[in-house]
Swiss-Prot record:
This is Small ribosomal subunit protein uS2. It comes from Chloroflexus aggregans (strain MD-66 / DSM 9485). Transmembrane segments: none annotated. Coiled coil: none annotated. GO terms for cellular component: cytosolic small ribosomal subunit. GO terms for biological process: translation.
Length: 238
């Protein structure tokens, strides 16, 4: 089966992105042992053959999800991940959270949809000039509300149902997102470093989840997979 998987990244690309550097050996999760190649100068070195295989499996899965017409939710709120998560999700026409995970995003989706509708309605009212009929103070208050909602929900606009899969940069930091996705039965694809627990992750991509270049590389590959799946869907409907 592995031979049939798309080979979407090279060892060289991974090395250049620093994807092989794990955490100090005293900060590891023993469950990551199968993904570790060796230790050097007190740092675990990730087995990049496993990274290639993990990304290939994740790529194929994401392609299948978007080919069915479902969406991917990209999640990465750590500073190093914020820009890549937003830009790659937008490029692929998917959803993202890159500032703060709000509890209940997946497990209390009915409330989430109401907030998204409120944001949409307020922006619509502003854009057609309704705010001009209000006092300056009232208009400023509503603008502030739009800004506040956008800080949390900008990447979720248009999301009217739960995603078909979730892609996470650093599941240790995004523990709440992992728990909610697991509870809702949403498959999880994640960049998993040597200090993480891989057990809740359906598609483990073992790699450095702190290096900006590594995060950009992995996130862009997942975005490519989403785009490929959407193209397949379009072709099948022609």
């Amino acid at each position: 089966m592995t031979n049939q998987l798309p080979r979407v990244v090279t060892i060289r690309e991974l090395l250049e992105a620093g994807a092989h550097f794990g955490h100090p050996t005293n900060r590891w999760n023993p469950k990551m042992k199968p993904y570790i190649f060796t230790a050097r100068n007190g740092i675990h070195i990730i087995d990049l053959q496993k990274t290639v295989a993990g990304l290939s499996q994740a790529y194929q899965f994401i392609t299948e999800v978007t080919a069915r017409g479902e969406k991917i939710l990209f999640v990465g709120t750590k500073k190093q991940a914020q820009e890549a998560v937003m830009e790659e999700a937008i490029r692929a026409g998917q959803f993202y959270i890159n500032r703060r995970w709000l509890g209940g995003t997946l497990t209390n989706f009915a409330t989430m949809k109401r907030r998204l509708k409120l944001l949409s309605d307020l922006e619509e009212q502003r854009d057609r000039g309704d705010f001009a009929r209000l006092t300056k103070a009232e208009a400023a208050k509503l603008e502030e509300k739009i800004d506040r909602l956008n800080r949390v929900f900008a990447g979720l606009k248009g999301m009217d149902r739960l995603p078909g899969a979730i892609f996470i940069v650093d599941p240790r930091k995004e523990e709440l997102a992992v728990r909610e996705a697991d509870k809702e039965g949403i498959p999880i694809v994640a960049m998993v470093d040597t200090n993480c627990d891989p057990d809740p992750i359906d598609y483990v991509i073992p790699c450095n989840d702190d290096a900006i270049r590594g995060i950009r590389l992995m996130t862009s590959k997942i975005a490519d997979a989403a785009i490929e799946g959407m193209r397949r869907r379009e072709s099948s409907q022609e």
